[in-house]
A protein has these predicted regions:
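HDAC/HDAC-like amidohydrolase catalytic core signature
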Residues: 2-345
């Protein structure tokens, strides 16, 4: 049932997804050199309760701000599609996937595996989040877009292969990396995480795998307590993990410096075919869950560095996936700065 038209005249359905008929992509500008944007009201159905910081308003704030940007009409919009279990199983164990499904259906209010609030629709929404990010991967590899930003929830970087924690259900960025490797034969994938919290789930997924380079800047000490500088990978993955923990108060100089001086040379040596960002905007100066002081200009410069990395050997293919960020106005401003740089690339 059609409810309304958005300001560009695209038909919106009750779930908030753009009607795209036979295509999962809709290009406003009709070119393949545009930035893709993934958002749907489906992601608002993961309900966390009053007072919880990981709330639906995080996404609506981003959408409303981007929708007022002068370049919004030139973005390529992506319709989310639910990930099938084969895709989720690229990262997560069958037992864990079943735990999430059964506990959501049974009316649990939080996952038994960790501190992640759930509701009856959380399993379905998490499948849509992971599937939407995979649709963004399709967009850049099939040259429907040059890069993409995915405003999804629940977030994912704390989810390990067999455990949900830290507000996360399925690890969207890890699934996207494995999906790119399986479907598009990406031999080397680089993931950079600038969330204020360490991406322990992503690190765990690839710790012994040299085909995925993972780098994280994060506040320490802070939840989840992982990500020491000495954690550099093991076995075949030795040297493919890079952690740069910083104390409270770190800002543009420290975080940008780690990306420019440490990650960029490593990326040139690694030569990724595909680049992913875990874009956590809780490293912003005003976030209630962290004590970093990165500002919007800082996120612009971080984005520029990541775009440079994406062009090292991957033809610019880059997908950015929302993680944290809990100041409702701050997350929108940071996301706008980030997407503006993606768009200008």
């Amino acid at each position: 049932m059609v409810e309304k038209l958005d300001r560009r005249g695209f038909i919106m359905v009750s779930l908030g997804a753009v009607v795209l008929l036979d295509s999962q992509f809709l290009s406003c500008g009709g070119k393949n050199d545009m930035t893709a944007f993934l958002y749907s009201d489906i992601y608002l159905r993961h309900l966390t309760g009053d007072g919880h910081p990981e709330k639906p308003e995080r996404l609506t704030s981003i959408y409303n701000r981007l929708n007022q940007s002068e370049w919004y009409g030139d973005l390529t919009l992506i319709r989310p599609e639910s990930a099938n279990l084969d895709v989720i199983s690229l990262v997560h164990s069958h037992d864990y996937i079943e735990t999430v499904r059964k506990e959501c259906e049974a009316g649990y209010t939080s996952l038994s595996t960790g501190d992640t609030v759930i509701c009856g629709e959380s399993y379905a929404v998490a499948l849509e989040a992971a599937g939407g990010v995979c649709s963004a991967v399709d967009a850049v590899f099939e040259e429907k877009a040059k890069n993409a930003f995915c405003a999804v929830r629940p977030p994912g970087h704390h989810a390990t292969p067999d455990r949900g924690m830290g507000f996360c259900v399925f690890n969207n960025v890890a699934i996207a990396a494995r999906y790119a490797q399986r479907k598009y034969n990406a031999e080397r994938v680089l993931i950079a995480d600038w969330d204020v919290h360490h991406g322990n789930g992503t690190q765990d997924t690839f710790y012994t795998d040299g085909s995925v380079f993972f780098m994280s800047t994060h506040q320490s000490p802070l939840y989840p307590g992982t990500g020491k500088i000495e954690e550099t990978g093991a076995g075949d993955g030795e040297g493919a993990t890079m952690n740069r923990p910083f104390p409270a108060g770190a800002g543009n100089s420290e975080i940008i410096g780690a990306f420019r001086d440490d990650l960029l040379p490593a990326a040139r040596a690694f030569r990724p075919d595909f680049t992913l960002i875990s874009a956590g905007f809780d490293s912003r100066v005003d976030d209630p869950l962290g004590s970093f002081e990165v500002d919007d200009d800082g996120f612009r410069e971080l984005t520029e560095i990541m775009l440079e990395i994406a062009h090292v050997s991957g033809g610019g293919r880059l997908v950015s996936v929302l993680e944290g960020g809990y100041n409702i106005e701050g997350i929108a401003r940071a996301a706008e700065a980030h997407v503006d740089e993606l768009f200008k690339a």
